Amino acid sequence: MRRKIIAANWKMYKTCAETESFIKEFIELSKGYEEKEIVICPPFTSLYVASKLLKDTAIKLGAQNMFWEKEGAYTGEISPIMLKDLNCTYVIIGHSERRNYFSETNEMINKKIKSAFNYGLIPIFCVGEKWEERERGKTEEVITKQVREGLEGLEKENVEKIVIAYEPVWAIGTGHSAKGEDANEVAGLIRKIISEMYDTEVSQKIRIQYGGSVNPQNITEFLSQNEIDGALVGGASLKPQSFWNIVKS
Protein backbone atom coordinates (compact mmCIF):
# COMPACT_ATOMS: atom_id res chain seq x y z
CA MET A 1 0.00 0.00 0.00
CA ARG A 2 1.49 3.33 -1.08
CA ARG A 3 1.36 6.00 1.60
CA LYS A 4 -0.26 9.23 0.43
CA ILE A 5 2.05 12.26 0.24
CA ILE A 6 0.94 15.91 0.27
CA ALA A 7 3.62 18.50 -0.49
CA ALA A 8 3.41 22.29 -0.23
CA ASN A 9 5.30 24.21 -2.91
CA TRP A 10 5.47 27.79 -1.69
CA LYS A 11 7.27 29.03 -4.81
CA MET A 12 8.60 32.60 -4.30
CA TYR A 13 6.40 33.39 -1.31
CA LYS A 14 7.03 33.89 2.42
CA THR A 15 9.80 35.63 4.31
CA CYS A 16 11.55 33.91 7.23
CA ALA A 17 9.13 35.54 9.67
CA GLU A 18 6.11 34.42 7.63
CA THR A 19 7.56 30.91 7.40
CA GLU A 20 7.99 30.75 11.17
CA SER A 21 4.43 31.93 11.75
CA PHE A 22 2.97 29.40 9.27
CA ILE A 23 4.92 26.41 10.59
CA LYS A 24 4.14 27.12 14.25
CA GLU A 25 0.43 27.29 13.45
CA PHE A 26 0.52 24.25 11.16
CA ILE A 27 2.34 22.13 13.75
CA GLU A 28 -0.50 22.83 16.19
CA LEU A 29 -3.16 21.99 13.60
CA SER A 30 -1.51 18.72 12.56
CA LYS A 31 -0.33 17.52 15.97
CA GLY A 32 -0.59 13.73 16.23
CA TYR A 33 -1.50 13.27 12.56
CA GLU A 34 0.31 10.39 10.85
CA GLU A 35 -1.94 9.09 8.06
CA LYS A 36 -0.37 10.95 5.12
CA GLU A 37 3.22 12.09 4.66
CA ILE A 38 3.46 15.89 4.78
CA VAL A 39 6.21 17.87 3.03
CA ILE A 40 6.77 21.63 3.11
CA CYS A 41 8.97 23.22 0.42
CA PRO A 42 9.70 26.85 1.32
CA PRO A 43 12.02 29.17 -0.64
CA PHE A 44 15.76 28.70 -0.04
CA THR A 45 15.93 31.70 2.31
CA SER A 46 13.46 30.06 4.70
CA LEU A 47 14.94 26.54 4.76
CA TYR A 48 17.06 27.17 7.85
CA VAL A 49 14.22 28.49 10.00
CA ALA A 50 11.88 25.76 8.70
CA SER A 51 14.48 23.09 9.45
CA LYS A 52 14.78 24.21 13.08
CA LEU A 53 11.01 24.31 13.61
CA LEU A 54 10.29 20.95 11.93
CA LYS A 55 13.15 19.10 13.63
CA ASP A 56 11.07 17.16 16.17
CA THR A 57 7.97 16.71 14.02
CA ALA A 58 6.90 14.13 11.42
CA ILE A 59 6.66 16.87 8.77
CA LYS A 60 9.37 16.57 6.12
CA LEU A 61 11.31 19.48 4.64
CA GLY A 62 11.85 19.88 0.92
CA ALA A 63 13.56 22.36 -1.40
CA GLN A 64 12.17 23.73 -4.65
CA ASN A 65 15.25 23.19 -6.81
CA MET A 66 18.98 22.38 -6.71
CA PHE A 67 22.04 22.31 -8.94
CA TRP A 68 23.66 18.98 -9.83
CA GLU A 69 27.21 19.75 -8.69
CA LYS A 70 28.38 19.25 -5.10
CA GLU A 71 30.06 22.69 -5.04
CA GLY A 72 31.83 25.14 -7.32
CA ALA A 73 31.71 28.48 -9.13
CA TYR A 74 27.98 28.44 -9.94
CA THR A 75 26.79 31.86 -8.82
CA GLY A 76 23.30 31.84 -7.36
CA GLU A 77 22.96 28.06 -7.25
CA ILE A 78 22.32 25.71 -4.31
CA SER A 79 23.98 22.30 -4.04
CA PRO A 80 22.55 18.99 -2.79
CA ILE A 81 24.93 18.90 0.17
CA MET A 82 23.68 22.33 1.26
CA LEU A 83 20.15 20.94 1.25
CA LYS A 84 21.19 17.84 3.21
CA ASP A 85 22.93 20.10 5.71
CA LEU A 86 19.55 21.77 6.32
CA ASN A 87 17.85 18.38 6.88
CA CYS A 88 15.93 18.39 3.61
CA THR A 89 14.42 15.03 2.71
CA TYR A 90 12.88 16.02 -0.63
CA VAL A 91 13.69 18.34 -3.53
CA ILE A 92 11.35 19.39 -6.33
CA ILE A 93 13.01 18.87 -9.72
CA GLY A 94 11.75 19.83 -13.17
CA HIS A 95 8.81 22.03 -12.19
CA SER A 96 7.20 23.55 -15.28
CA GLU A 97 8.07 27.05 -14.07
CA ARG A 98 11.76 26.01 -14.06
CA ARG A 99 11.39 24.48 -17.52
CA ASN A 100 9.56 27.55 -18.81
CA TYR A 101 11.31 30.54 -17.21
CA PHE A 102 14.80 29.07 -16.79
CA SER A 103 14.96 26.84 -19.88
CA GLU A 104 15.58 23.63 -17.94
CA THR A 105 15.86 20.68 -20.31
CA ASN A 106 15.16 16.99 -19.72
CA GLU A 107 18.94 16.44 -19.76
CA MET A 108 19.49 19.01 -16.98
CA ILE A 109 16.62 17.53 -14.98
CA ASN A 110 18.14 14.05 -15.38
CA LYS A 111 21.46 15.33 -13.97
CA LYS A 112 19.65 16.89 -11.01
CA ILE A 113 17.69 13.70 -10.26
CA LYS A 114 20.87 11.59 -10.34
CA SER A 115 22.69 14.09 -8.12
CA ALA A 116 19.79 14.23 -5.63
CA PHE A 117 19.93 10.45 -5.17
CA ASN A 118 23.74 10.51 -4.93
CA TYR A 119 23.48 12.85 -1.94
CA GLY A 120 20.54 11.17 -0.21
CA LEU A 121 17.68 13.41 -1.34
CA ILE A 122 14.39 12.15 -2.77
CA PRO A 123 13.29 13.97 -5.93
CA ILE A 124 9.73 15.12 -6.51
CA PHE A 125 10.04 14.91 -10.29
CA CYS A 126 7.53 17.08 -12.17
CA VAL A 127 6.11 16.30 -15.59
CA GLY A 128 3.21 17.76 -17.54
CA GLU A 129 1.95 18.92 -20.91
CA LYS A 130 0.96 22.39 -22.16
CA TRP A 131 -2.60 23.17 -23.23
CA GLU A 132 -1.76 23.25 -26.95
CA GLU A 133 -0.04 19.87 -26.62
CA ARG A 134 -3.13 18.43 -24.96
CA GLU A 135 -5.39 19.94 -27.63
CA ARG A 136 -3.27 18.32 -30.36
CA GLY A 137 -3.48 14.92 -28.64
CA LYS A 138 0.22 14.98 -27.72
CA THR A 139 -0.13 14.32 -23.97
CA GLU A 140 1.18 10.74 -24.14
CA GLU A 141 4.10 11.72 -26.38
CA VAL A 142 5.15 14.64 -24.14
CA ILE A 143 4.84 12.73 -20.85
CA THR A 144 6.68 9.70 -22.26
CA LYS A 145 9.59 11.86 -23.41
CA GLN A 146 9.80 13.73 -20.08
CA VAL A 147 9.70 10.54 -17.99
CA ARG A 148 12.09 8.51 -20.15
CA GLU A 149 14.68 11.28 -20.52
CA GLY A 150 14.32 12.43 -16.91
CA LEU A 151 14.94 8.93 -15.52
CA GLU A 152 17.50 7.75 -18.07
CA GLY A 153 20.39 5.81 -16.53
CA LEU A 154 18.88 5.66 -13.03
CA GLU A 155 19.18 2.55 -10.89
CA LYS A 156 16.00 0.60 -10.18
CA GLU A 157 16.41 0.90 -6.39
CA ASN A 158 16.44 4.70 -6.70
CA VAL A 159 13.54 4.96 -9.13
CA GLU A 160 11.21 3.07 -6.78
CA LYS A 161 11.77 5.80 -4.13
CA ILE A 162 10.99 8.71 -6.45
CA VAL A 163 7.84 10.81 -6.26
CA ILE A 164 6.48 11.90 -9.64
CA ALA A 165 4.18 14.92 -9.77
CA TYR A 166 1.90 15.13 -12.79
CA GLU A 167 1.27 18.84 -13.23
CA PRO A 168 -0.48 19.78 -16.47
CA VAL A 169 1.06 23.16 -17.28
CA TRP A 170 -2.32 24.61 -18.25
CA ALA A 171 -3.67 23.93 -14.75
CA ILE A 172 -0.85 25.52 -12.71
CA GLY A 173 -1.87 28.77 -11.05
CA THR A 174 -4.81 29.20 -13.43
CA GLY A 175 -7.65 28.03 -11.22
CA HIS A 176 -8.41 25.34 -13.83
CA SER A 177 -7.64 21.86 -12.59
CA ALA A 178 -7.73 18.65 -14.60
CA LYS A 179 -10.61 16.27 -14.00
CA GLY A 180 -9.81 13.46 -11.57
CA GLU A 181 -10.24 10.73 -14.18
CA ASP A 182 -8.02 12.58 -16.70
CA ALA A 183 -5.25 12.97 -14.11
CA ASN A 184 -5.66 9.30 -13.18
CA GLU A 185 -5.28 8.30 -16.82
CA VAL A 186 -1.95 10.15 -17.09
CA ALA A 187 -0.78 8.69 -13.77
CA GLY A 188 -1.55 5.25 -15.22
CA LEU A 189 0.46 6.16 -18.31
CA ILE A 190 3.42 7.13 -16.10
CA ARG A 191 3.28 3.74 -14.37
CA LYS A 192 3.16 2.03 -17.77
CA ILE A 193 6.29 3.91 -18.91
CA ILE A 194 8.11 3.02 -15.67
CA SER A 195 7.14 -0.65 -16.01
CA GLU A 196 8.53 -0.66 -19.56
CA MET A 197 11.77 1.01 -18.42
CA TYR A 198 12.15 -1.13 -15.29
CA ASP A 199 9.40 -3.53 -14.25
CA THR A 200 5.86 -3.67 -12.89
CA GLU A 201 7.05 -3.93 -9.29
CA VAL A 202 8.91 -0.61 -9.54
CA SER A 203 5.97 1.05 -11.30
CA GLN A 204 3.68 0.01 -8.44
CA LYS A 205 6.05 1.30 -5.75
CA ILE A 206 6.51 4.86 -7.01
CA ARG A 207 4.12 7.48 -5.69
CA ILE A 208 2.42 9.80 -8.16
CA GLN A 209 1.00 13.16 -7.13
CA TYR A 210 -1.35 15.46 -8.99
CA GLY A 211 -0.54 19.17 -9.04
CA GLY A 212 -2.33 22.09 -10.65
CA SER A 213 -4.85 24.31 -8.86
CA VAL A 214 -5.39 21.78 -6.07
CA ASN A 215 -7.56 23.16 -3.26
CA PRO A 216 -9.60 21.90 -0.28
CA GLN A 217 -12.69 21.65 -2.50
CA ASN A 218 -11.24 19.39 -5.22
CA ILE A 219 -8.55 17.38 -3.40
CA THR A 220 -10.85 14.39 -2.71
CA GLU A 221 -11.57 14.06 -6.44
CA PHE A 222 -7.87 13.39 -7.02
CA LEU A 223 -7.08 11.33 -3.93
CA SER A 224 -9.97 8.97 -4.70
CA GLN A 225 -8.30 7.91 -7.97
CA ASN A 226 -6.53 4.56 -7.80
CA GLU A 227 -3.30 5.70 -9.52
CA ILE A 228 -2.89 8.99 -7.61
CA ASP A 229 -1.05 8.97 -4.29
CA GLY A 230 -1.10 12.60 -3.25
CA ALA A 231 -0.79 16.21 -4.35
CA LEU A 232 1.77 18.92 -4.95
CA VAL A 233 -0.04 22.02 -3.75
CA GLY A 234 0.77 25.60 -4.74
CA GLY A 235 -1.34 28.61 -3.78
CA ALA A 236 -3.67 26.65 -1.48
CA SER A 237 -0.68 25.67 0.69
CA LEU A 238 0.16 29.25 1.67
CA LYS A 239 -2.36 29.42 4.54
CA PRO A 240 -2.06 26.91 7.40
CA GLN A 241 -5.78 26.12 7.65
CA SER A 242 -6.19 25.72 3.90
CA PHE A 243 -3.20 23.37 3.67
CA TRP A 244 -4.38 21.41 6.70
CA ASN A 245 -7.84 21.00 5.13
CA ILE A 246 -6.13 19.46 2.09
CA VAL A 247 -3.89 17.17 4.16
CA LYS A 248 -6.66 15.77 6.37
CA SER A 249 -9.16 15.30 3.51
Swiss-Prot record:
CDD domains: TIM (cd00311). It comes from the Bacteria. Substrate binds at residues 9-11, 173, 213, 234-235. InterPro entries: Aldolase_TIM, TIM_sf, TrioseP_Isoase_bac/euk, Triosephosphate_isomerase, Triosephosphate_isomerase_AS. Pfam families: TIM (PF00121). Gene3D superfamilies: Aldolase class I (3.20.20.70). Its main location: cytoplasm. Its EC number is 5.3.1.1. One of its GO terms (biological process) is gluconeogenesis. GO terms for molecular function: triose-phosphate isomerase activity. Coiled coil: none annotated. Pathway: Carbohydrate biosynthesis; gluconeogenesis; Carbohydrate degradation; glycolysis; D-glyceraldehyde 3-phosphate from glycerone phosphate: step 1/1. It is found in: Cytoplasm. It catalyses: D-glyceraldehyde 3-phosphate = dihydroxyacetone phosphate. Involved in the gluconeogenesis. Catalyzes stereospecifically the conversion of dihydroxyacetone phosphate (DHAP) to D-glyceraldehyde-3-phosphate (G3P). HAMAP family: TIM_B. Belongs to the triosephosphate isomerase family. Homodimer. This is Triosephosphate isomerase. It comes from Dictyoglomus thermophilum (strain ATCC 35947 / DSM 3960 / H-6-12).
